[in-house]
Amino acid sequence: MFGKRAVIITQCLGAGGKSTAKDIADSLSWWGVSCIKRRSFKLMSEIDWNKIPDKKRNEMTSKLISLARKMKAIDYSRPANTGIIVKMKFFAVRMLQTGLGKDNPEYTDFKYWKANGWLDKTRPWK
């Protein structure tokens, strides 16, 4: 998952869209995704696209087009840069896996991390 990019688009009636997008972004961050873009839209009356007022539809469309242009401009032949927060989370989980592996060498996650070399010098973003 390291080096991947994600776009989160939420749309809801009333409140809750931003917190939902934040929860999804938090989960993606723990999975190793550093480049996460979020767009959240609140609707107060209708969820049917044809019944949404033109002003709101134009606002939503322009924000999504702007985001699409930014994502299109990215050079996808190179992986996304792994952020410092994601690296810190990786090292915290690495310490946890090392401790659990000392207590129980047959622990499945420990064996997986050891097989990939992540408990040694190998890093998944390199």
State each model region's role:
Residues 1-40, 112-113:
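Helix-loop-strand module that forms the ligand-binding subsite of alpha/beta enzymes
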Residues 34-126:
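Glycine-rich phosphate/pyrophosphate-binding loop and the adjoining helix
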